[in-house]
Amino acid sequence: MGAMRIATLTSGGDCPGLNAVIRGIVRTASNEFGSTVVGYQDGWEGLLADRRVQLYDDEDIDRILLRGGTILGTGRLHPDKFRAGIDQVKANLADAGIDALIPIGGEGTLKGAKWLADNGIPVVGVPKTIDNDVNGTDFTFGFDSAVSVATDAIDRLHTTAESHNRVMIVEVMGRHVGWIALHAGMAGGAHYTVIPEVPFDISEICKRMERRFQMGEKYGIIVVAEGALPKEGTMELREGEVDQFGHKTFTGIGQQIADEVHRRLGHDVRTTVLGHIQRGGTPTAFDRVLATRYGVRAARACHEGQFNTVVALKGERIRMISFDEAVGTLKKVPMERWVTAQAMFG
């Protein structure tokens, strides 16, 4: 295809690397094909409201490689509101002369992108999530940065926990999958890690911590994914709230585990919830490179007519996969990875 007018947007939670994708799209579209790129602001809401800006291949675009967050802004939109606005979306894209749309986001965003593709809009999706739970791709950008933040926090908590003879609970993001907890726990030398894929036994956690204290190691580090749940009947949880999209909020599982460990063992137990700090800041070198490669490949896919696809990392190569492969199921931590992590507990 010749020169095109491409639109892009960022939707869902922010993460390091979004700007690197935008930069990759703009520079590739402009330099290789003479195309122009438009950015819709604040995700799907901006597309529905026709809030758009022209993105130029200039010094401003060049500088965003280092920046966290997204220059376009982001947001979440209820699927029902989005689907009800399909006619408006089509009209806005037509009025702006858009030939292709590149949505950048996680599972929910990619489901929305698939729905647009099913309704005749030329779409190329770019997977984004710090959780690393998008199926069909080995890694999503933002994950490495989040793991680095969590690992740094664990490194720092080792010294304060040891100084005060404490058990430290570190709660990290991961509503349905435990990739951040698993990787940060291994990299940070945690003494136990709890992930959503494997229901935990509070008695086993307490046993591990008590064994450490008996052996003279007067502190412990436990990493907990926010979506972790206990084995049925082993621990009673306090109910979480439900957000505007019907999702139960899991923040607080770390404190609940801390309370139970303290009740059973009597040790001083403190909780650190990393929360949104995992989303912020400068992307790691790995995420900058991966996000740039995603942006370049997405722009090229548009000009090659490879629509209704998603860019993905397979081994060392960036490939195009179907929306069905990307959004069919979540990519969860395999049991063999969990077994490997267990060998480091204690």
From Swiss-Prot:
Give one GO molecular function term.
Answer: AMP binding
Q: Which gene encodes it?
A: pfkA
Asked if the record carries the keyword Transferase, the reply is yes
Q: What does this protein do?
A: Catalyzes the phosphorylation of D-fructose 6-phosphate to fructose 1,6-bisphosphate by ATP, the first committing step of glycolysis.
**Active-site residues?**
131 (proton acceptor)
Question: Where, subcellularly, is it found?
Answer: Cytoplasm
* The enzyme's E.C. designation: 2.7.1.11
User: What Gene Ontology biological process does one annotation of this record name?
Assistant: fructose 6-phosphate metabolic process
Family membership, please give it.
Belongs to the phosphofructokinase type A (PFKA) family. Mixed-substrate PFK group III subfamily.
Write down the NCBIfam families for this protein, in alphabetical order.
Answer: PFK_mixed, PRK03202.1
Q: What is the lineage of its organism?
A: Bacteria, Bacillati, Actinomycetota, Actinomycetes, Mycobacteriales
In the UniProt record, does the keyword ATP-binding occur? yes
**Annotated source species:** Corynebacterium efficiens (strain DSM 44549 / YS-314 / AJ 12310 / JCM 11189 / NBRC 100395)
Where on the tree of life does the source sit, at the highest rank?
A: Bacteria
Sorted alphabetically, the keyword list is: ATP-binding, Cytoplasm, Glycolysis, Kinase, Magnesium, Metal-binding, Nucleotide-binding, Transferase
Q: Which residues bind Mg(2+)?
A: 107
Q: Which cofactor does it need?
A: Mg(2+)
Q: What is its main location?
A: cytoplasm
Entry protein name: ATP-dependent 6-phosphofructokinase
Could you say which residues bind substrate here?
Answer: 129-131, 166, 173-175, 226, 270, 276-279
Residues engaged in binding ATP? 13, 76-77, 106-109
Provide the Gene Ontology terms for cellular component.
Answer: 6-phosphofructokinase complex
Self-association and partners: Homodimer or homotetramer.
Annotated pathway? Carbohydrate degradation; glycolysis; D-glyceraldehyde 3-phosphate and glycerone phosphate from D-glucose: step 3/4
Reactions catalysed, semicolon-separated, are:
beta-D-fructose 6-phosphate + ATP = beta-D-fructose 1,6-bisphosphate + ADP + H(+)
The top EC class is: transferase
* Site feature: Important for substrate specificity: 108
